[in-house]
Amino acid sequence: DVKEPLKGNVRHSVSKWCFGDYKLDEFCEICKHIGIESVELLDPVDWPIVQKHGLTVAMAQGAGLGIDRGFNDPALHDELVASYEKVIPMVADAGLTNLICFSGRRNGVTDLQGWENCEKGLKRLIPLAEKHKVVLTMELLNSVGHKDYLCDHTVWGAELCRRIGSPNFKLLYDIYHMQIMEGNIIENIRKYHPYFSHVHTGGSPGRAEIDETQELYYP
């Protein structure tokens, strides 16, 4: 239940996986009623369902090999590139912009080697992403819950963006994950926001509502 619709000061999107009991059609109707503009982290088969309700998909998925198997592993580059080459045009054809990607596990490599590995794989896709005006967006995740995840600090992700050097590669900044890893949320947003294409919010601990029970509270 929502007491009043959203004011529209922020363009709100929600991740469907957090609300698994709802059918997507029903969920979209609820979202539209309260002023949410997007339902995200959906595969291509679901995009038309969202769009028929006048909503969008702020962060698309459907390419890649999951969180643990990402661009840090050169042995996966050919498979990853083939997957993204298929989905990037689909994102553009649907009128969407952001497509999620992942670094994968660290697997014992240094930060430097991780940058080099990810840069090598992702740069194979940048010309296609630029052609279709799609932004490949790597999510910053905590490596406590996602064991050994490489892209787990804002400064690491920002340096990868700098190395790739294209507006078509950016970061998904997740307040919940980064509060666990590093805190300093407001300063990091101010400093690194040019590298963000999208932001996820969630309280810590427990990814709860951002209220007075959480480490961060935005009234």
Which role does the model predict for each range below?
Residues 57-59, 138, 173:
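Hydrophobic residues in well-ordered beta-strands that form the structural core
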Residues 41, 60, 101:
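Short beta-strand and adjacent tight-turn residues that come in two discontinuous sequence segments
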Residues 44-55, 109-110, 213-216:
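Active-site-adjacent beta->alpha loops and helix N-cap segments on the catalytic face
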Residues 61-69, 203-204:
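Short, acidic/turn-prone active-site loops that include or flank metal/cofactor-
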Residues 4-6, 73-171, 180-182:
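Active-site acidic/histidine proton-transfer and metal-coordination neighborhood
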Residues 1-35, 40, 45, 95-97, ...:
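Histidine-acidic metal/acid-base catalytic patches
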Residues 47-61, 118, 134:
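Short acidic, glycine/proline-enriched helix-loop-strand junctions
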